[in-house]
Amino acid sequence: MSQSQRNSDGWTPRTRLGRMVQDGDVTSMEQALNSGLPLKEPELVDQLLPGLDDEVLDINMVQRMTDSGRRVKFRCVVAIGNRNGFLGYAEGRDDQVGSAIQKAIDVAKLNLISVDRGSGSWEDSAGGVNSLTRNAEGKAGSVTVEVMPAPQGLGLAAAETVSNILELAGVEDAWTRSNGNTRTTVNLAKATYNALRNASQSRTPRRAAAKQREQEVSE
């Protein structure tokens, strides 16, 4: 393969969407998400949305019995975002904490969504993006999280895990409500992500029609 087919980081696209990004046919993350093509390459996200922030929400040891004895792995829950409308979430497992975190970050890039932000109140100036445009609800396990629009200046009325995710998404003002075993960080985080993704899908029927985006995020 010629050098011109590689970018400066040595990335060789393996998918149609990746090639479209490299050729300049897709130049923004919004275009990529609305293309109807699946995100399968973390490097694609690095090209279109560099400098994403990440937050490790939970680290847990997971033990499993095998023929060779007890095996221990680390499960890391990670959320990523640009704090301006894009958010991703995933879990990663590995024998080493650092590797588990990196795996989660890479998968979170493939789960990236465009958050449906808005002014949050009719009293706020038109065109604001400090909150959500509508109520958003998501579920994971026994946990249900509802995120509701709020006027500018309220801040985030939310638990720490929920607040961290909303901040990564660029949501500055919101009321939230949660039910179920909210002490389980992984389900609380997943339900929050699912709430924002469900709201995003409701304004993009084409993407919502895709089977992958109809289901709640899974491990």
UniProtKB/Swiss-Prot annotation:
GO terms for molecular function: rRNA binding; structural constituent of ribosome. With S4 and S12 plays an important role in translational accuracy. InterPro entries: Ribosomal_Su5_D2-typ_SF, Ribosomal_uS5, Ribosomal_uS5_arc, Ribosomal_uS5_C, Ribosomal_uS5_euk/arc, Ribosomal_uS5_N, Ribosomal_uS5_N_CS, Ribsml_uS5_D2-typ_fold_subgr. Part of the 30S ribosomal subunit. Contacts protein S4. The N-terminal domain interacts with the head of the 30S subunit; the C-terminal domain interacts with the body and contacts protein S4. The interaction surface between S4 and S5 is involved in control of translational fidelity. Keywords: Ribonucleoprotein, Ribosomal protein, RNA-binding, rRNA-binding. It comes from the Archaea. Disulfide bonds: none annotated. Residues 196-219 are annotated as: Disordered. SUPFAM superfamilies: dsRNA-binding domain-like, Ribosomal protein S5 domain 2-like. It holds the Pfam family Ribosomal_S5. This is Small ribosomal subunit protein uS5. PANTHER family: 40S RIBOSOMAL PROTEIN S2, RIBOSOMAL S SUBUNIT. The keyword RNA-binding applies. GO terms for cellular component: cytosolic small ribosomal subunit. Residues 52-115 form the S5 DRBM domain. GO terms for biological process: translation. Belongs to the universal ribosomal protein uS5 family.
